[in-house]
Regions:
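Pyridoxal 5′-phosphate
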Residues: 1-274
Length: 274
């Protein structure tokens, strides 16, 4: 931050140095996520990535269909994006979650039609910790040639296995894995076209105008590497915390809403009953 503080979009020496480091970070991240560097778009947060994936894809591909599938238990940024698309004429299908807190692959299969252009689901619930089988769902979505799949992996990244290669669009955020706030990304398959939501420059392949926050995005490569390398240790720590939380809640007249199975500890939703 102190040495390479230049604007990576500038032509002067400091700018070129920052740009080189930024692209090195992009390439390293792409290698870890099993994709090409041009499939990594840096953003400021998961909410922005979700909006870019959902609204950006829908607006750019409306000629492919008008139907979008999601669930009734998404992050608020996804819900807001869906509400906006609905207000301008898109058909949004909100699948109800099961008692285990997830959407099943068959739910998506039954809801898909020839007019469906996008399915967007959260991988791990930020409220209950329920884990939706996004790998199975991606396989179902890809049986429809005009439909793509977006997964919000903000809560799952670095904590559970993610089928990176199966996801057409994927959201993650640095601060959920002990990285810097203000740093996130959208993984986008290179053949997909998005409508930019921020105008004013050619940064991020023309997908996000404005000066790039080079220091935090450069640091993101190391943040991701440490998260993936330490995933098993993180899982063990979360399991221990989850047991502690679960045992503690049993001491109170509380009703538990988190599923016992297919849940990422220590997420534990409960409410004290009168």
């Amino acid at each position: 931050m102190l040495d390479e503080y230049g604007n990576p979009d500038s032509l002067h020496q400091q700018g070129r140095k920052a740009a080189k480091l930024l692209e090195q970070s992009r390439s390293r991240i792409a290698s870890m996520l099993k994709c090409s560097p041009e499939e990594i778009l840096f953003t400021s947060c998961a909410s922005e990535s979700n909006s870019m994936a959902i609204v950006g894809y829908a607006l750019a591909n409306r000629n492919r269909g008008n139907r979008i599938i999601t669930s009734n238990s998404e992050h608020s940024s996804t819900t807001a994006a869906m509400n906006f698309l609905e207000s301008i004429g898109f058909e949004v299908v909100r699948l109800p979650i099961h008692e285990d807190g997830t959407i099943h692959a068959k739910d998506v299969q039954d809801a898909l039609t020839k007019d469906t252009l996008l399915v967007s689901l959260i991988h791990v619930s930020n409220e209950t910790g329920a884990i939706t089988p996004i790998g199975e769902i991606a396989d179902v979505v890809h049986t429809h040639p005009t439909c793509v799949f977006h997964a919000d992996c903000t809560q799952s990244f670095g904590k559970v296995d993610i089928p990176f290669e199966k996801l057409d669009l994927m959201t993650m955020s640095a601060h959920k894995i002990h990285g810097m706030k203000g740093s996130a990304l959208l993984k986008k398959k290179k053949n997909l076209v998005l409508q930019p939501l921020i105008f004013g420059g050619q940064q991020e392949q023309g997908m996000r105008g404005g000066t790039e926050n080079a220091p935090v995005h450069i640091a993101l490569a190391k943040t991701i590497r440490l998260a993936l390398e330490g995933q098993k240790q993180t899982q063990a720590q979360m399991k221990k915390s989850g047991i502690t939380s679960s045992n503690g809640s049993m001491k109170f007249p509380a009703r538990t809403f988190s599923p016992r199975k297919m849940r990422l500890p220590p997420f534990f939703a409960s409410a004290l009953m009168p």
